[in-house]
Amino acid sequence: MKTICMMRDLYKALAEFEAQFEKEYDLSLNEAMILCALQEAKEEMTSTALSARTGMAASHTSKVIRAVEEKELIKRALGKTDKRQMYFSLTPKGKERLKELNLEKVEVPERLKGVISGLDKG
């Protein structure tokens, strides 16, 4: 039971962080994860690759992609060899937006600080 209670506390802390993050940056964490994945890849990615990289379900990834496209932070292009395949990349506005993300502006709940510092070590 202790593990479930700890997971509940982590979930609540993450929800609190996400609300603060979205208020500060006008981006959901999922939208930010799409931008981060594209930045780390340093090349165009398919929605399938973005889904795998972020851990989101394919249907949810499509919704998030549409949201960041509407904000003009990413763009889509047809595949060069397979015109049915779509590839996504950061726009200049998206790259600039990533530079603006300063997490010091958003208070990370204590419960998450330990988890985050543990991930940095791995």
Describe the residue ranges of each PLM region.
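Surface-exposed, interaction-prone regions with an acidic/low-complexity signature
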Residues: 1-5, 58, 111-116
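N-terminal leader segment of winged-helix/HTH proteins
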Residues: 1-25, 72-73
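Short amphipathic alpha-helical segments with heptad-repeat character
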Residues: 4, 8-11, 55, 95-102, ...
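Amphipathic, well-ordered alpha-helical segments in soluble domains
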Residues: 10-13, 30, 64, 104
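N-terminal helix-turn-helix DNA-binding core of bacterial DNA-binding proteins
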Residues: 17-57
